[in-house]
């Protein structure tokens, strides 16, 4: 055992037997290597582990040096929104589909993780967005997002009208099905499907991508990540909401605005030593290979 990481947290929400098998294999291997291991409570219950340290995501964030998330990008997003509040490194073993955020190959995870635990890895900081639904007379409702914050109708798809202010200066009004506000991390997710640009992770930028706008002149906009975005609504409707990473929904009541800004904390994401962002893009998106 080395001094880079002493306490390892095992995180995830296993939906398939293969993911559960990976959790168990990882737990046994880390214990055999002499690491202190803390297991998320649901995983310990599923594996029927007795007399082992368990905890919530918050407890893991407070106590562990590294959290290993087993699952797909959805699992990673759900865990990372909480873990980002703490000074903890996060890495993922891919048991999902695309796996933009979960780098470790499940068939070779232990060897790759061994290198990481020995200090041979690449680290980067990914910023989050903070979304507030607020009105002067009402208490704020706040959530965070690693990928994107999406304005959309709550139940039935329909055109909505809204105004966008950037740093309290009017930018544009829009009639569309909604708006995607994305981080660089989220630029390869929902935003990409809506025609948004791909931003490399180190860019301090946010994209605003219209969803089915009513005019052809509406185009994606890239702004500095230090900007504050305010959404105002010309026709009040009770069925509007914003969603964070397609996992948390905040309803918008009459008279309320939405404020979106860069979060004060970052996700400490680490990758295997041979990680390449552009190689990941090429592989996941099916880009063509080198010509010569």
Curated annotation (Swiss-Prot):
BP-aspect Gene Ontology terms: NAD metabolic process; NADP biosynthetic process
**SUPFAM superfamilies linked:** NAD kinase/diacylglycerol kinase-like (SSF111331)
The record's section on Pfam families has:
NAD_kinase, NAD_kinase_C
InterPro entries (UniProt xref): ATP-NAD_kinase_N, ATP-NAD_kinase_PpnK-typ_C, NAD/diacylglycerol_kinase_sf, NADK
| Catalysed transformations (reactions) | NAD(+) + ATP = ADP + NADP(+) + H(+)
Q: Which residues of this protein are catalytic? A: 73 (proton acceptor)
Q: What cellular-component terms does GO give this entry?
A: cytoplasm
Q: What does this protein do?
A: Involved in the regulation of the intracellular balance of NAD and NADP, and is a key enzyme in the biosynthesis of NADP. Catalyzes specifically the phosphorylation on 2'-hydroxyl of the adenosine moiety of NAD to yield NADP.
Name the chain's protein: NAD kinase
Q: Specify the species.
A: Salmonella choleraesuis (strain SC-B67)
Gene encoding the protein: nadK
